[in-house]
Amino acid sequence: MEPVDPNLEPWNHPGSQPKTACNQCYCKKCSYHCLVCFLTKA
């Protein structure tokens, strides 16, 4: 694992960015797309 900057929020860590953009779909797959999706959709 690469070293992580503790000052960065977890979803800003390198390598944690989802490969696809967030969308407005509320299905289970899209709700678990990333932490931001999970917090706003779940």
UniProtKB/Swiss-Prot annotation:
Subcellular location: Host nucleus, Host nucleolus; Host cytoplasm; Secreted
Coiled coil: none
GO molecular function: metal ion binding; protein serine/threonine phosphatase inhibitor activity; RNA binding; RNA-binding transcription regulator activity
Main location: host cell
KW Ribonucleoprotein (keyword) present: no
Cellular component terms (Gene Ontology): extracellular region; host cell cytoplasm; host cell nucleolus
Location of the region described as Interaction with human CREBBP in the Swiss-Prot/TrEMBL record: 1-24
GO annotation terms (biological process): positive regulation of viral transcription; symbiont-mediated perturbation of host chromatin organization; symbiont-mediated suppression of host innate immune response; symbiont-mediated suppression of host translation initiation; symbiont-mediated suppression of host type I interferon-mediated signaling pathway
Residue(s) carrying N6-acetyllysine: K28
Positions bearing the site annotation: Essential for Tat's translocation through the endosomal membrane: W11
Modified how: Phosphorylated by EIF2AK2 on serine and threonine residues adjacent to the basic region important for TAR RNA binding and function. Phosphorylation of Tat by EIF2AK2 is dependent on the prior activation of EIF2AK2 by dsRNA. Asymmetrical arginine methylation by host PRMT6 seems to diminish the transactivation capacity of Tat and affects the interaction with host CCNT1.
Keywords: Acetylation, Activator, AIDS, Apoptosis, Host cytoplasm, Host nucleus, Host-virus interaction, Inhibition of host innate immune response by virus, Inhibition of host interferon signaling pathway by virus, Interferon antiviral system evasion, Metal-binding, Methylation, Modulation of host chromatin by virus, Modulation of host PP1 activity by virus, Phosphoprotein, RNA-binding, Secreted, Transcription, Transcription regulation, Ubl conjugation, Viral immunoevasion, Zinc
Disulfide bond positions: none
Chain residue ranges for the region called Cysteine-rich: 22-37
Domain characteristics, as noted in the entry: The transactivation domain mediates the interaction with CCNT1, GCN5L2, and MDM2.
Note: HIV-1 lineages are divided in three main groups, M (for Major), O (for Outlier), and N (for New, or Non-M, Non-O). The vast majority of strains found worldwide belong to the group M. Group O seems to be endemic to and largely confined to Cameroon and neighboring countries in West Central Africa, where these viruses represent a small minority of HIV-1 strains. The group N is represented by a limited number of isolates from Cameroonian persons. The group M is further subdivided in 9 clades or subtypes (A to D, F to H, J and K). This truncated variant has a premature stop codon. It may have arose as a consequence of tissue culture passaging.
Entry similarity comment: Belongs to the lentiviruses Tat family.
Subunit structure of this chain's protein: Interacts with host CCNT1. Associates with the P-TEFb complex composed at least of Tat, P-TEFb (CDK9 and CCNT1), TAR RNA, RNA Pol II. Recruits the HATs CREBBP, TAF1/TFIID, EP300, PCAF and GCN5L2. Interacts with host KAT5/Tip60; this interaction targets the latter to degradation. Interacts with the host deacetylase SIRT1. Interacts with host capping enzyme RNGTT; this interaction stimulates RNGTT. Binds to host KDR, and to the host integrins ITGAV/ITGB3 and ITGA5/ITGB1. Interacts with host KPNB1/importin beta-1 without previous binding to KPNA1/importin alpha-1. Interacts with EIF2AK2.
Function in brief: Transcriptional activator that increases RNA Pol II processivity, thereby increasing the level of full-length viral transcripts. Recognizes a hairpin structure at the 5'-LTR of the nascent viral mRNAs referred to as the transactivation responsive RNA element (TAR) and recruits the cyclin T1-CDK9 complex (P-TEFb complex) that will in turn hyperphosphorylate the RNA polymerase II to allow efficient elongation. The CDK9 component of P-TEFb and other Tat-activated kinases hyperphosphorylate the C-terminus of RNA Pol II that becomes stabilized and much more processive. Extracellular circulating Tat can be endocytosed by surrounding uninfected cells via the binding to several surface receptors such as CD26, CXCR4, heparan sulfate proteoglycans (HSPG) or LDLR. Neurons are rarely infected, but they internalize Tat via their LDLR. Through its interaction with nuclear HATs, Tat is potentially able to control the acetylation-dependent cellular gene expression. Modulates the expression of many cellular genes involved in cell survival, proliferation or in coding for cytokines or cytokine receptors. Tat plays a role in T-cell and neurons apoptosis.
The protein, known as: Protein Tat
Species whose genome carries this gene: Human immunodeficiency virus type 1 group M subtype C (isolate ETH2220) (HIV-1)
